[in-house]
């Protein structure tokens, strides 16, 4: 066999890791293109359907919330029943929901279908991480995560441009619908390739052999399947109660859910510990967090997602509403950011296996410096300079995003047992989703508060400077966590 090939117990067939990656990358790109294209198509969608501001907010929030609450339970189910099967189920749900969303007659129907889209994406996402952990090791795993970073960069670049072109060619109504419809051929291709290239039942036997000392065995037949339904429900409620206030700020009462979410998280941790102490197999083995690479890696990654995604949100708002730039022009301006992110991911993929902790530190410092440079660019734009000045610091931020993503995924999942790859990946992504929701709420809130200062009520400079100051602070916190992780890794070496 070549270095790209592998077998699984119970089958004489030889599988190819390159084919496996192709299958995994297709839905990843579908989901990310969907996010970036929908963000850019919201004005057209609002006009075509006559949507209210609260309805439009749920076009985004419903999708994100559904992903957040499904990730960890779906990862657990994949670890038990087989990741390939759950992957195909998630991809099927996402594809069918995308087609139906493109045909939605009202915003209410669209929002319901967006929830189903989020469920599909939430089911398949942890399986991708689990499958990489299971079938890739060492530098091959690092390269796989680097290719994921490249796919993310391409998707982020394509989304806004694709939606802008579709709306320009077909008008507002057909244009936003086309953004959903493009998922049908891609999803069908992913399902066909997955049916031929994923191991399915053989994978479960392989997991069973892997699980001799690390936890619950996974086999084709067994007398008891321990799903820990109470733990699953507690975590779903916790994620929902914490994320909802930051994503639906139409009424002050929603902030009362936040302390309930924190309480729910405390109860969930206590339940999982007690459940394991009684000889059961909890949904999430909290001992995973005692692994320095996984525990600190999850924390560092979540902090990074508090600093990073909010930047693009406020830049898009500022350029379109404050400077008067079109949606397509914003997409073109952020294209160099996406390209440099791809380069950062590939560069990091070559070096993360040995220098991943140092790359994390470098990336977070680069976010701090480039955010300060972006503030200077905004100052110049407000004084008459071209808005293209903002593209320069965004290029460096893109490189930092790509480099950090590949390094953090590699380090965080490095010591995770293959049998826990799905649940570990789901928990990691849940932390990132929650951090993103919290960050966007805080940073955009500061942005609009600053923007309202002054007699004119449109002080865009103050809004951007204050918001970027928050980003710099969050990035500095991430740097601190990354430095701690770097010191631990140096001692291990």
Give a label for each model feature.
Residues 31, 60-63, 67, 117-118, ...:
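Structural signature of transmembrane alpha-helices in multi-pass secondary transporters
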């Amino acid at each position: 066999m070549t270095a790209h090939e592998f077998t699984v117990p119970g089958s004489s067939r030889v599988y190819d890791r390159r084919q496996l990656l192709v299958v995994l990358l297709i839905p990843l790109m579908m989901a990310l293109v969907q996010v970036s294209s929908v963000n850019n198509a919201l004005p057209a969608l609002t006009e075509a359907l006559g949507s209210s501001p609260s309805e439009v907010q749920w076009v985004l929030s419903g999708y994100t919330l559904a992903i957040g609450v499904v990730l960890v339970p779906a990862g657990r189910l994949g670890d038990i029943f087989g990741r390939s099967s759950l992957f195909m189920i998630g991809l099927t749900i996402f594809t069918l929901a995308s087609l139906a969303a493109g045909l939605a007659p009202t915003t209410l129907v669209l929002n319901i279908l967006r929830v189903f889209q989020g469920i599909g994406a939430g089911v398949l996402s942890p399986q991708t991480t689990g499958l990489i952990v299971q079938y890739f090791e060492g530098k091959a795993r690092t390269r796989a995560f680097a290719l994921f970073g490249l796919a993310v960069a391409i998707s982020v670049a394509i989304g806004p441009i694709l939606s802008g072109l579709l709306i320009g060619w077909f008008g507002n109504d057909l244009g936003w619908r086309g953004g959903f419809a493009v998922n049908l051929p891609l999803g069908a291709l992913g399902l066909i390739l997955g049916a031929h290239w994923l191991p399915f039942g053989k994978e479960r036997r392989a997991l069973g052999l892997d699980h001799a000392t690390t936890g619950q065995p996974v086999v084709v037949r067994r007398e008891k399947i321990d799903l820990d339904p109470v733990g699953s429900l507690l975590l779903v409620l916790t994620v929902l109660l914490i994320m909802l206030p930051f994503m639906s700020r139409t009424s002050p009462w929603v902030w009362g859910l936040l302390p309930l979410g924190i309480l729910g998280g405390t109860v969930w941790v206590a339940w999982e510990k007690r459940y394991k102490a009684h000889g059961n197999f909890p949904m999430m083995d909290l001992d995973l967090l005692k692994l320095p690479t996984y525990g600190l890696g999850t924390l560092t990654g979540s902090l990074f997602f508090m600093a990073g995604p909010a930047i693009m949100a406020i830049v898009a708002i500022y350029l379109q509403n404050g400077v008067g730039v079109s949606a397509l022009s914003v997409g073109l301006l952020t294209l160099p950011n996406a390209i440099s992110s791809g380069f950062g991911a590939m560069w990091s993929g070559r070096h993360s296996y040995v220098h991943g902790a140092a790359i994390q530190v470098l990336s977070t410092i680069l976010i701090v410096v480039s955010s300060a440079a972006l503030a200077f660019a905004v100052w110049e734009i407000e004084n008459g300079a071209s808005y293209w000045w903002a593209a320069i610091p965004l290029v460096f931020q893109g490189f930092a995003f790509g480099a950090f993503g590949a390094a953090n995924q590699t380090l965080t999942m490095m010591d995770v047992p293959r049998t826990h790859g799905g649940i570990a990946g789901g928990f990691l992504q849940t932390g990132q989703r929650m951090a993103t929701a919290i960050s966007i709420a805080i940073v955009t809130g500061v942005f609009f508060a600053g923007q309202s200062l002054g007699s004119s009520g449109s002080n865009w400079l103050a809004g951007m400077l204050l918001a970027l100051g928050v980003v710099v602070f969050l990035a500095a916190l991430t740097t601190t966590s990354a430095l701690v992780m770097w010191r631990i890794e140096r001692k291990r070496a």
